[in-house]
């Protein structure tokens, strides 16, 4: 029987330090500063391992985490910003006993229910991820929670400061930790060893200073790492996962190729999937066709820079794109998938604009746009990616049966990830009220017929 009132009991909180006596100071780049005051990204990975004991689980995870932090020293440190004359930096000091806080918990909940696709209260996931302490002058970088489900398995909750890690760095760290735990060795494959070089990120236009000035202005003209307040999530918000198979994506792609007259469209899995989700979201809301919708996404820029950054570059290297004033009317248009095709064509234009010359414009635009945006405007954005390979995080007990980005309930995001079964499909996560879940689900299904 599904337990919808599951309790999570905190058993202990331990500090896990890397076996290193070296100190480290790593300044933030403008790629990091764009996300400075946004809420952390919370992920939870579910593992079905009925025969596992709590003592063996915690012992292996603690020792392998310590070994992994030797390569990922910044994650054991703190984000510090104590003077208006300096910029924020990540500081790790063994003398200050810097460490990652690992929470050990136990739940009487139903792991299969939590890791399913069906509607589940979004608040059920909040107790599976740890808090990240933040003050004006200091913020923890990473916190981890292991929740043991007796005779079922465990969940691994990871809370990461958005100004320190993007999705690619988070996925790289998780796969490195999993590798160390499974192989019981400290050596990592080359593609899981992070590059901490900051000199390679050039700032010819002074974008760092412009971003810092805007954050200082937003904090009563003083440096502050305190985050923007997060939306309070009620019990009426449900988390649901929808799936597009490889065949679904192929059919949607063929529909665009047949019906669109535009040339050189971007028909990647991301564009097809996100365009389809945008269409369903806008039609779900309905309303005045002359209304505007805010639509955005972020792209990895490591390979787009000249010269490019290494694929293993540690930190943020993502830039947002989109439009705060997308007209709903063309997307609401009925007949032959016209709204979906409009969304594909719109996304194509934004993807084509992903170039180094547009970085500053794209990173500064939100500061002005949010000031003039009226309350209640529909917002659609993306968390995650189908290219992160997050389901490859095998700690020795098999791959996760489900991965959820918990924080999509705070900011109207949808989450995208590769299908956990390796079939080439896409998992789409949404958090909506019950009536909206029913409308969105109906639109999602009908559009694939």
Swiss-Prot record:
Catalyzes the malonylation of the 5-O-glucose residue of anthocyanins, using malonyl-CoA as the malonyl donor. Acts only on anthocyanin substrates containing a 5-O-glucosyl moiety. Acts on the four native A.thaliana anthocyanins, A3, A7, and to a lesser extent, A6 and A10. Can also use the non-native anthocyanin compounds cyanin (cyanidin 3,5-diglucoside), malvin, pelargonidin 3,5-diglucoside, peonidin 3,5-diglucoside, cyanidin 3-coumaroylglucoside 5-glucoside, delphinidin 3-coumaroylrutinoside 5-glucoside and petunidin 3-coumaroylrutinoside 5-glucoside as substrates. Its EC number is 2.3.1.-. This is Malonyl-CoA:anthocyanidin 5-O-glucoside-6''-O-malonyltransferase. SUPFAM superfamilies: CoA-dependent acyltransferases. InterPro entries: CAT-like_dom_sf, Plant_metabolite_acyltrans. Keywords: Acetylation, Acyltransferase, Transferase. Belongs to the plant acyltransferase family. The keyword Signal does not apply. GO terms for biological process: anthocyanin-containing compound biosynthetic process. Pfam families: Transferase. Expressed in flowers. Detected in leaves, stems, roots and siliques. Disruption phenotype: Absence of malonylated anthocyanins. The modification N-acetylmethionine is found at residue 1. The glycosylation of the coumaroyl group in anthocyanins A6 and A10 likely occurs after malonylation of the 5-glucoside by 5MaT, which could explain why this enzyme is more active on anthocyanins A3 and A7 than on A6 and A10. The lineage of its organism: Eukaryota, Viridiplantae, Streptophyta, Embryophyta, Tracheophyta. Optimum pH is 6.0-7.5. Gene3D superfamilies: Chloramphenicol acetyltransferase-like domain. It catalyses: anthocyanin A3 + malonyl-CoA = anthocyanin A5 + CoA; anthocyanin A7 + malonyl-CoA = anthocyanin A9 + CoA; anthocyanin A6 + malonyl-CoA = anthocyanin A8 + CoA; anthocyanin A10 + malonyl-CoA = anthocyanin A11 + CoA. It comes from the Eukaryota.
């Amino acid at each position: 029987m599904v337990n919808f009132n599951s309790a999570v009991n905190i058993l202990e909180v331990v500090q896990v330090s890397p076996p290193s006596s070296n100190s480290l100071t790593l300044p933030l780049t403008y790629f990091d500063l764009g996300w400075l005051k946004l809420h952390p990204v919370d992920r939870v990975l579910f593992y079905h391992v009925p025969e596992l004991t709590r003592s063996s689980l915690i012992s292996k995870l603690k020792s392998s985490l310590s070994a992994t932090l030797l390569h990922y020293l910044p994650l054991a440190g703190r984000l510090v910003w104590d003077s208006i004359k300096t910029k924020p930096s990540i500081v790790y000091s063994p003398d200050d006993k810097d460490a990652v806080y690992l929470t050990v918990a136990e739940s009487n909940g139903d792991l299969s229910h939590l890791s399913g696709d069906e509607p589940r209260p979004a608040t059920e996931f909040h107790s599976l991820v740890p808090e990240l302490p933040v003050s004006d002058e200091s913020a923890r970088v990473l916190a981890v929670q292991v929740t043991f489900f007796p005779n079922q398995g465990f969940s691994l909750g990871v809370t990461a400061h958005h100004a320190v890690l993007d999705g690619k760095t988070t996925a790289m760290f998780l796969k490195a930790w999993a590798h160390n735990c499974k192989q019981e060795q400290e050596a990592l494959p080359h593609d899981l060893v992070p590059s901490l070089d900051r000199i390679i990120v050039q700032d010819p236009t002074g974008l760092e200073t412009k971003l810092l000035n805007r954050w200082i202005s937003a904090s009563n003209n003083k440096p502050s790492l305190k985050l923007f307040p997060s939306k309070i999530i009620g019990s009426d918000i449900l988390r649901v996962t929808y799936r597009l198979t490889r065949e679904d994506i192929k059919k949607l792609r063929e529909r665009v190729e047949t019906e669109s007259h535009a040339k050189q469209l971007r028909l990647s899995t991301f564009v097809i999937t996100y365009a389809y989700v945008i269409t369903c979201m806008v039609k779900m809301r309905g309303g005045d066709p002359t209304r505007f919708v805010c639509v955005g996404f972020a792209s990895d820029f490591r390979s787009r820079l000249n010269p490019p950054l290494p694929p293993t570059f540690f930190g943020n290297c993502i830039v947002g794109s989109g439009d705060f004033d997308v007209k709903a009317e063309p997307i609401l248009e009925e007949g032959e998938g016209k709204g979906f095709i409009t969304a594909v064509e719109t996304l194509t234009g934004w993807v084509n604009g992903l170039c180094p010359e547009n970085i500053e414009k794209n990173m500064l635009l939100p500061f002005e746009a949010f000031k003039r945006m009226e309350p209640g405007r529909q917002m659609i954005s993306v968390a995650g990616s189908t290219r992160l390979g997050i389901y490859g995080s095998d700690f020795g007990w098999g791959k996760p049966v489900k991965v959820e980005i918990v924080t999509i309930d705070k900011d109207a995001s949808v989450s995208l990830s590769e299908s956990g079964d390796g079939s080439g499909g896409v998992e789409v996560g949404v958090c909506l009220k019950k009536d909206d879940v029913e409308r969105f689900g109906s639109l999602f299904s009908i559009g694939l017929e």
